[in-house]
Amino acid sequence: MSKKIIECGLSQKSIQDAIDQLKVYQTELNNKNELFVKRLSELGLEVVQTTMESIPDEEKGSYYTEIIYDKQGNIIGSSIRLSGNNVLFIEFSAGITYGTNDYPLPSGNSYGMGTYPSKKEKSDWDNPNGWWYTDESGQSHHSYGNRAYMPMYHAEQAIVIAVRKIAKEVFG
């Protein structure tokens, strides 16, 4: 928003006019803040939905996205609800044995394939032949792991890239 100057004299009417102008400005600022949060939420949800739709059905389970409103109808955030056996792996992966790049974190560290600490000197995450595990019933299964699709990471990156542009569009 551009700089707003409100001038007033010392008369009662002038002070009341300044108060009225401040109330209008407060309403405008609240409306713009709501639009700003809505635009960022919509962008994040769009990226999450696009990422989720790219995931094979057997890996993603089901998901639901929504924009969250308070009792007055103001947008206060967005929500993504996942259900299924492998939902954590959608963001973080598990036992992946094929190459993907690491992703940088704001702290300067990275996460990605093989970055989770293991108690063994060498984990199985980089075995090109995959690995075997035994399920609860004692049945052995072969796996190449679950890829990290990272819908939340990609949504965060899209928001970080667009936040200044959207702020300029909304606040002028």
Describe the residue ranges of each PLM region.
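N-terminal, Lys/Arg- and Ser/Thr-rich interaction peptides
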Residues: 1-28
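Charged, low-complexity interaction tracts
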Residues: 2-7, 57-172
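Generic alpha-helical secondary structure signal
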Residues: 13-16, 20, 35, 153, ...
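Short amphipathic alpha-helical segments with heptad-repeat character
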Residues: 23, 27-34, 38, 153
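Amphipathic alpha-helical hairpins
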Residues: 24, 28, 53, 57-58
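Non-globular disordered terminal and juxtamembrane segments underlying protein topogenesis/assembly
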Residues: 33-51, 163
